[in-house]
Amino acid sequence: MGLPWYRVHTVVLNDPGRLLSVHIMHTALVSGWAGSMALYELAVFDPSDPVLDPMWRQGMFVIPFMTRLGITNSWGGWSISGGSITNPGIWSYEGVAGAHIVFSGLCFLAAIWHWVYWDLEIFCDERTGKPSLDLPKIFGIHLFLSGLACFGFGAFHVTGLYGPGIWVSDPYGLTGKVQSINPAWGVEGFDPFVPGGIASHHIAAGTLGILAGLFHLSVRPPQRLYKGLRMGNIETVLSSSIAAVFFAAFVVAGTMWYGSATTPIELFGPTRYQWDQGYFQQEIYRRVGVGLAENLSLSEAWSKIPEKLAFYDYIGNNPAKGGLFRAGSMDNGDGIAVGWLGHPIFRDKEGRELFVRRMPTFFETFPVVLVDVDGIVRADVPFRRAESKYSVEQVGVTVEFYGGELNGVSYSDPTTVKKYARRAQLGEIFELDRATLKSDGVFRSSPRGWFTFGHASFALLFFFGHIWHGARTLFRDVFAGIDPDLDAQVEFGAFQKIGDPTTRRQAV
């Protein structure tokens, strides 16, 4: 049936058995990809340093999703939070991957069975003997079952009543772990950063889905509505399904890019807005201030800053710094972080503390400018040395490190001072290993960036798909030239416009 590539799906348009078959095969492909991708990631994942080389630095995509749902252990004897374990149980990373692959195989066999045995009694209308589907009834069944799954996830899995709970962390991504969640039924449940809202919203939405499903199973649509929305046409189902999918894709693109309780920074990396707002920098300075108030020395106060917190405050972990067409993990860009060198404090010869102005997200290069506590420029690395007034040499800038590997070390030679001033533009300074992976030094995005870009792009495409198929089903008679209420037998090919005797073709 020489169909063009963009019309091949019409072969299942009036064939319920094979329509079911291709959907089962699609599920097999999705599940098989998920399981295979998980096994591939587990083969290349290095769990040895969860602080400086976490999953998101290594470009892991499916491991974070398993982890946020409560999977933390591997049959390889390691745990995502570091350390070793002896009894990971069946629901380890490998167990979940294997379950997806087994499920994929079963779906594959089911798809073949339904393709071969397509002409089943269940698909036949007993009044006409022709294949047909009761689409409003099927909608009710699907709504009921998805509501049941939604309710079960919120009431049992997330709450820990029968399940592990989900990944929960503090606002700075330092203390994350899998734990059970109490539903948040107050106004706080609408805060996207409150995990309790995940439980309560799934319970509420699931309950609504169950009730709506039962409603659609027990109440038939009015005839006018049935005809108006073309409820008997399978393309109506396609159009509304695409709408549900693109809406969900837009929502998750937003929750991923802007951050939420469902996308913890320990699993997906920080958001770009945390760099833009100096989010981690402010917390670090607050902690240092608390240490100084407790009569600790500057060195002791900085030494108490967790390496994990300092690492978040580094521009290389900003997902917006990676170019769209730079493939590979963050580790393939600026390298594998080995250790925090410490916090550099710059001073001029008059003893004033100077702060390096940080590079904004969308700059590749940025002038090195050092300002005092009042924001007045006191030193820089000039573009034209002949006209410079504030060069490091002229101002006599020195640098001393507090905390980290260089704790207590100071430099006064201008070359070294300028080197660390340039690196301080990028946030906290880390030693990076670029040799192991042959990293090229060009920043990459985190899985947060890839997920957002992918889902926003497909959401846009699916939006147009919804408009396209919605228009086709609503205006089918206009496009086809056939009145859907036409009862008379029409001879295809006899008229230029089907069923219109005024356009009878002339014999040649």
UniProtKB/Swiss-Prot annotation:
It is a multi-pass membrane protein. Binds multiple chlorophylls. PSII binds additional chlorophylls, carotenoids and specific lipids. The keyword Acyltransferase does not apply. The chain crosses the membrane at residues 21-36, 101-115, 140-156, 203-218, 237-252, 457-472. GO terms for cellular component: chloroplast thylakoid membrane; photosystem II. Keywords: Chlorophyll, Chloroplast, Chromophore, Membrane, Photosynthesis, Photosystem II, Plastid, Thylakoid, Transmembrane, Transmembrane helix. Its main location: plastid. It comes from the Eukaryota. The keyword Plastid applies. It comes from Dioscorea elephantipes. GO terms for molecular function: chlorophyll binding; electron transporter, transferring electrons within the cyclic electron transport pathway of photosynthesis activity. InterPro entries: PS_antenna-like, PS_II_antenna-like_sf, PSII_PsbB. It is found in: Plastid, Chloroplast thylakoid membrane. This is Photosystem II CP47 reaction center protein. Coiled coil: none annotated. One of the components of the core complex of photosystem II (PSII). It binds chlorophyll and helps catalyze the primary light-induced photochemical processes of PSII. PSII is a light-driven water:plastoquinone oxidoreductase, using light energy to abstract electrons from H(2)O, generating O(2) and a proton gradient subsequently used for ATP formation. Gene3D superfamilies: Photosystem II CP47 reaction center protein. GO terms for biological process: photosynthetic electron transport in photosystem II. PSII is composed of 1 copy each of membrane proteins PsbA, PsbB, PsbC, PsbD, PsbE, PsbF, PsbH, PsbI, PsbJ, PsbK, PsbL, PsbM, PsbT, PsbX, PsbY, PsbZ, Psb30/Ycf12, at least 3 peripheral proteins of the oxygen-evolving complex and a large number of cofactors. It forms dimeric complexes. Belongs to the PsbB/PsbC family. PsbB subfamily.
